[in-house]
Amino acid sequence: MTLEYSISAGHPFCMGVMSQTNGIHIAMPFPESEGKECGMLLYKAGHELARIVFPECYKMGEVYVLFINMQMEADYTYLFFCGEEQFTDPYAHIIRGREKWGRRKEDRPRAAFAEDTFDWEDDMPLRIPYEDSVFYSLHVRGFTKHASSQVSARGTFAGLAEKIPYLQQLGITAIECMPVYEFDEIIPNPAYQESLKLRDNGQAAYLEEPAWKQRINYWGFGDGETYYMATKAAYAKDPQHADRELKLLIRQLHKNGIEIILQMYFSPRYTQGYIREVLRYWVSCYHVDGFHLFGTDIPMRLLGTDPYLKHTKLIHENPEADAVYKGKKIPYYRNLACYGDAFRYDARRFLKGDEGMLSVMAEHMRQNSSLEGVINHITDYRGFTLSDLVSYDRKHNEE
């Protein structure tokens, strides 16, 4: 089968690939691509269909901006190439090849073309003030994976949607989800192949212990191969339509008065512009209510002054509210918030009955900046669950 297509100029309004009725619009950066042939590898049903070379005349800086006029089909996937190197679209909205949790395919994951046909039914973020908020942090897979959850779609977005009545009974106003973007949960060990060589050469005695082959990154944080604009397919009852399943969950949460906050970790290798694009995308396409951001180089000044994010909760250990609002009046909607660990440790000492903690807790309760919210939490993923915290009065390590 031969693919018929034509290439014309595009519009540099946003990065990534956008599927349209008569083709695809591409705005994709190719760093260090001078003198190299760049383009797209198009696949149908897993087999290479076409190798499309991008003309240099459609290059702006490092970005190829063009439109490919072609007949689209539902099962198309793609990769990009730059010289001899192939890479997956870092702006991909759908990733194929990671549908099974903890299983790695030999092939590089490919991007698929997303269709924006979801009916939001006039849904919009809830904008609940911080002073009226009670957050409930959870892991989408872990929250309902056990049989005790009593849901039909355990460990999925659909399973979480079944627990909305339970969440309402708790009296919470928002769930804060650990990463739901397409992170790589498999952590390979570079020493594993070396250990195999030593074993095969009869030198296994030099190994103190057999090297582990791989481990699971359960939480989702880390610097592996991550696609921040794609929904985690392994978290869906129907992995082929994970994006739709998450949108259904968010729409149902909003109908029941519950916000959704997404935890996101960015390592220093991601640019400030990319981080902002990721957040804008999730607000625009998924109607999320906010983000809890982790990382050493999070551009809080840039994000805090972005007009597209003014109604979006932005939570960080240092939201830089003084710099964001310097010389400006108090914001009509406080979207910035500080998330620190001081309250967690002091609250535990207070519950234990340590001396001198009453005044400390009173000071925590009085903290209420006019510029930013203050998130007081007593447990998170770095330690006990809330149930464990209140179930024991002494250590039980011997058991």
Which residues are covered by each model-predicted region?
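The feature marks proteins involved in alpha-glucan
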Residues: 1-23, 58-137, 145-149
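Short edge beta-strand/loop segments characteristic of extracellular beta-sandwich folds
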Residues: 25-31
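Aromatic- and acidic-residue-enriched carbohydrate-binding clefts of CAZyme catalytic domains
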Residues: 149-156, 187-255, 266-285, 396-399
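Active-site neighborhood of glycoside hydrolase catalytic domains
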Residues: 244-325
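An acidic-aromatic substrate-binding cleft motif
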Residues: 114-178, 182-183, 220-221
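Conserved, mostly hydrophobic/aromatic
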Residues: 28, 138, 167, 177, ...
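Conserved alpha/beta catalytic core and glycan-binding cleft of carbohydrate-active enzymes
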Residues: 102-107, 112, 287, 300-399
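Hydrophobic faces of well-ordered beta-strands that scaffold small-molecule active sites
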Residues: 134-136, 175-177, 260-262, 291, ...
